[in-house]
Regions:
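Phosphate/NTP-binding elements of NTP-utilizing enzymes
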Residues: 1-364
Length: 364
């Protein structure tokens, strides 16, 4: 054996496997994301918290991941990518629970099968007997991906599996989450469970699960001073010119709202470019200590991805409905869907003050 052969063997030995980093693997292999607002394949720079969530979930030390995320922040994409990576690199039986069977079947046919078919490392291992119209996905080695209703007792009790994914837990009946977690008892040391949803009510099963985790919050790095900080609604600032005798001019609020850096006070412009810069070096920071080993929580609110001015108008409309008619539905929607926080019947007080001289920010 000559020197060149020895060097080739050495390089092969030292080269990390293709699947060493799940984010890099997804970027290489998921070349198209069917039914996605984004064109092309998976790009980690678009929503950086998705890549961070993938690495955290697929880390061997993570047993349970709870993701209370705002709507339109990549929750479903994260689940699709995680399932695709597992079926290519660490196959095992999986159950994906939705609030009802119709939504479960839709998830398989609309979101899961299409992305599986994009990736040869998954597609090529499907069974020849797999039915492309079925909400059950069969692999040649006997692995099965089920999609079931969390509202049906038999679907929560009849399957033993290694992986459990749960979506839209705010719609699940009481105790369904615990039943789904019990499906992995036979695989306790190699199992993983991922639960993703907008929050529901304080004290419901999903909220209690999140409270058991280390409650990591998505933090951004301010481009003005480099300070790492969480997206906090109290640092939203309305322009003084938007104030009127009766309240706020919604159009001026939408056009002129900014975000104040928690450290240096710089007003960050409400643009996608600003948010991209902020998120580029962001990370999840633990806000507590998990009550069980391997229990991780990841929280993302809409400030990370959505126009601050647009969100501010939504908040003002919700406050006006609450103040004028006692209608709390808008506040509940804003808090659970956009701030990704659980709702309680008392609701708290919604305060608006968003100028440099006024009290800090807006609290729903």
């Amino acid at each position: 054996m000559n020197r060149a052969d020895l060097l080739a063997i050495g390089r092969q030995t030292l080269t990390p496997p293709d699947n060493a980093d799940p984010v890099a693997w997804c970027a290489r292999n998921v070349t198209h994301i069917p039914d996605s607002p984004f064109k092309g394949g998976y790009r980690p720079d678009r929503w950086p918290w998705v890549g961070h969530a993938l690495r955290i979930f697929l880390d061997p030390t993570t047993r349970v991941l709870a993701m209370p995320w705002a709507i339109q922040c990549g929750k479903t994409l994260t689940m699709r990518l995680a399932a695709t990576y597992l079926m290519a690199n660490d196959r095992g039986n999986m159950v994906i629970y939705m609030d009802n069977q119709e939504n479960a079947k839709d998830f398989t046919l609309r979101y899961l099968r299409p992305i599986f078919n994009v990736v040869p490392a998954v597609r090529d291992h499907l069974s020849v007997h797999d039915n492309a119209k079925s909400d059950t996905i069969d692999f040649a080695d006997g692995t099965i991906v089920y999609n079931n209703s969390a509202s049906t007792s038999k679907d929560l009790q009849r399957i033993s599996t290694r992986f459990v994914f749960g979506d839209e837990l705010w719609k699940w009946p009481r105790s369904a989450l615990g039943e789904s977690m019990a499906r992995t008892k036979a695989y306790e040391w190699t199992s993983k469970k991922l639960y993703a949803s907008q929050p529901g009510l304080v004290g419901d099963d999903f909220h209690n699960l999140v409270e058991m985790t280390d409650r990591r919050e998505w933090h951004f790095k301010a481009p003005c001073c480099g300070h790492l900080q969480a997206y906090d609604w109290s640092f939203i600032r309305f322009p003084e010119s938007a104030r009127t005798d009766t309240g706020w001019d919604h159009r001026k609020v939408e056009d002129g709202t900014t975000y104040e850096c928690a450290k240096c006070g710089t007003r960050l412009a409400d643009t996608n470019e600003t948010r991209n810069k902020c998120n580029a070096e962001g990370e999840f920071v633990p806000m507590g200590v998990a009550q069980k080993k391997g229990y991780v929580g990841l929280h993302v609110n809409a400030l990370a991805s959505t126009s601050w001015g647009s969100l501010s108008v939504d908040m003002l409309k919700a406050k006006e409905a609450s103040d004028s008619y006692g209608d709390e539905s808008g506040r509940m929607i804003f808090k659970t869907k956009y701030l990704a926080l659980p709702w309680s019947d008392d609701g708290g007080t919604m305060v608006t003050a968003a100028t440099a001289s006024g009290p800090p920010g807006i609290r729903p």
